[in-house]
Every structure is written in C-alpha cells, then in structure tokens.
Amino acid sequence: MPPNNVDIVREAYDAVNLGDLDMAVSCIAPDMEYVASGAVPGATGVFMGPEGVKEFIAGLYEEFDEPHADVSELLDAGDQVLVSATARGRGKLSGVEATWDTWQLWTVRDGKLVRGQGFTSREEALAAAGLDR
C-alpha cells in the first residue's frame, strides 16, 4: 500500500531532523513552494523547488546546532496535512537553547509535497486549512 499523506509529511520531518537533505528533497515535487512565516529565526520568504528547500534547511543548520522539530500532531485534512511541532536548537553564535512552537500546512499531490506554509499560531493554520469552522 502506498504511503498516505501523513506518512509522507512525517518522512520529510524525519529527514530534516536527521539533516538528510537528499531524503528531504525526495519528498517534494520539483515545483514545490514553501512560504516561511518568520517563526523560525532567520527564515522568512518563499523558497521554491528542491534548491529552495535545501536553502531553507541549510539555513536552519547554519543558525542552530542540531535543530530539531518535535512533532506533536499530524492532522489529515484530505490533500493537506497540518503539523503542530515544537522546534528547538542551540544558537551557534549565542550558545543559547531556543524553543518555539510552529505550525505548517502541507499540500500533498501524487505522493509529493507541492506546497508548505508556516504559521505563528494554530488558529492561523486551521483557518488556512479551512478547519476553523
């Protein structure tokens, strides 16, 4: 049985947590778009395709030693998956451990991530998924 959308998103998070850029990129479509909310320090803007995703992930590893997202929820919303996570990492310059809550909404098509968007609140993410009603 092919993986479901939640499994695909989980695999992508596992890859990023491991720092495995090749594995992370294998989960995305060539024309994938990720819109960063700025919830992650230093990560704001739109990142396109495999190179954009690599740039985003590499930025995390430039800012933090061993960045990690502890996923607490993966909510299946049809072709979308809402992720709630607590991210953490030790600042490379400051040495200070940072943690922050984060939410992303992922769209999956044909077994690949085609769009992702970060949010600074669960309410915003639920509204974007049409689940706030």
Q: Which functions belong to the PLM regions below?
A:
Residues 1-133:
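C-terminal and inter-domain tail/linker signature
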